[in-house]
Amino acid sequence: HAGRTVAEQGAVIGKLFANFAAVAAANPLADRRNGFTAEQIAAVGPDNPFIGFPYTKLMNSNAFIDQSAALILTSVAKAKSLGIPEEKWVYLHGCADTYDHWYISDRKDFHSSPAMRVAGEEALAMADTSLDQIGAFDIYSCFPSAVQLACQELGLATDDPRGLTITGGLPYFGGPGNNYVTHSIAEMMNRVRAEPGMKGLVTSCGNYVTKEAVGIYSTEAPHKPFAPKDPNIYQSVLNADKGRASTEAANGAATIETYTVMHDRAGPSFAILMGLLDDGSRFIANTPEDPELLSEMVANDYMGAQGRVAQYPPDPPRAAAAAEFAGPAAVGEHRIFLHRSEEH
């Protein structure tokens, strides 16, 4: 999509996450305070292997932590009755939650998130503010793609001088399962309390970049009552905007749309790919355990590579797919084979 080589992409996302690692290095609550450099994050080695190509271990969320955070949500009246000082009050100015198509095969492409775009637009509109009026961000960072997609859809540069995290992000601060955003909101409360009137924006992301949410926080009281829009209003538009048709019985000429190569402790184990048939329909596949093929798919960009796909075994009732291109693929209960073509 971006037109980069494998090496160029590694360097770009290494630099992106080095900025997160630097924030974590200065955060006493962070789990990994090493301050990894872009080169350390991108370099593949025994201590930093690929998990799912093109992402190394240091580009993945770190769930091996022991962390907790808490928030108290209440009304102004209750806060007053409890005697909580007003300088500690933080208001939610704008919020929205959306989701992209649950089935990845239903999406128009794999380099955008309409749900994040809409969540950002709705939250900013509710808060009567704009991106240039936000003083601090914490962008959900389970993997580089989550950050890149959020920035793209929000209209935020990945090297914005305001920074993209206040904690250090999931790989370095820590990724405590579904609880990370509790930490980012709690830290954002500290930030806006330290700079009264400043607005902070927090994003969250779940599943396969599926569920998206945005919240905007400030110590300044909103100028209007808290009244978020019914999410069904904008979610129905997202639901109707489907991508191309998919097939579970892929046969014929095929092109790789996108892919990843999964690794175990021994190295590359299999690839998962989304492919297109000549009629434009999409299929899901994975490769056989072919070390030569998998090494090629890691060393070179195979997006757009062409070949053939057919089901395996060839006889019903449980046919799957056999072909000439890359190696076996699973679609539902089917097994699909893509063998390398001579052209690639």
Protein language model features and the residues they cover:
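Conserved beta-strand elements of the Class I
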Residues: G135-A136, K199-L201
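Gly/Pro-rich active-site capping loops and adjacent beta-alpha segments
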Residues: Y208-T210
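Phosphate/diphosphate-binding loops
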Residues: G177-K199
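Conserved anion/nucleotide-ligand pocket segment
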Residues: C205
